């Protein structure tokens, strides 16, 4: 399976975008949104577990979130969000980065580890880890959309004098 097939975002990339960068952005976003329990489960299946060292231990901080009115208007500061970040280096010398919303140090650490592993072996870990996690996220998003759609109210306006 090629990267273009394994990571659907590659096909949407502009000509100026590096496909490897687009793939990495995609899997990093999937890892950041994944459930910690799913990442832990996959980590337990790796035998032997890869050796690594922390370049930056998991640490908690804040970031400003920006929004746009209507999704297209002028940007404005929406508010701050708690982030946890981590940087690891695998024995092969590959650096992995993990950024997650919230305060889960372990989630950021596992995200960084899997980022490093994906840089080395994306053909191995992409279908086994990234694709199932992405499908789970899509299913959760669809469920939330259906629940919200069930509460939607349609207002009709009546024309006077008809």
Question: What is the meaning of each model-derived region?
Answer:
Residues 1-47:
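Charge-rich, low-complexity N-terminal segments
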Residues 20, 24, 47, 119-162:
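Cysteine/selenocysteine-centered motifs that mediate thiol-based redox chemistry or coordinate metal-sulfur cofactors
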Residues 33, 82-84, 104-107:
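Generic alpha-helical scaffold signal
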Residues 36-37, 49-52, 123:
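A general structural signal for well-ordered secondary-structure junctions
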Residues 42-92, 97-98:
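Structured beta-strand/loop patches that form or line metal/cofactor-binding pockets in enzymes
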Residues 92-131:
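A hydrophobic, small-residue-rich beta->alpha segment in the mid-to-C-terminal subdomain
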């Amino acid at each position: 399976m090629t990267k273009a097939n394994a990571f659907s975002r590659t096909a949407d990339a502009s000509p100026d975008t590096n496909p490897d960068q687009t793939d990495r952005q995609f899997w990093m976003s999937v890892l950041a949104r994944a459930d910690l329990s799913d990442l832990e489960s996959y980590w337990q299946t790796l035998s032997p577990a890869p050796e690594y060292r922390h370049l930056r231990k998991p640490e908690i901080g804040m970031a400003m979130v920006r929004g746009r009115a209507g999704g297209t208007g002028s940007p404005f500061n929406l508010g701050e969000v708690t982030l946890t970040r981590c940087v690891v280096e695998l024995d092969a010398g590959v650096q992995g980065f993990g950024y997650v919303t919230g305060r889960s140090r372990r989630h950021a650490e596992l995200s960084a580890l899997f980022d490093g592993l994906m840089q080395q072996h994306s053909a191995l870990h992409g279908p086994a880890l990234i694709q199932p996690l992405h499908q789970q996220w899509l299913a959760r998003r669809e469920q939330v959309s259906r629940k919200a759609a069930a509460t939607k109210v349609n207002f009709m306006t009546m024309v006077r004098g008809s």
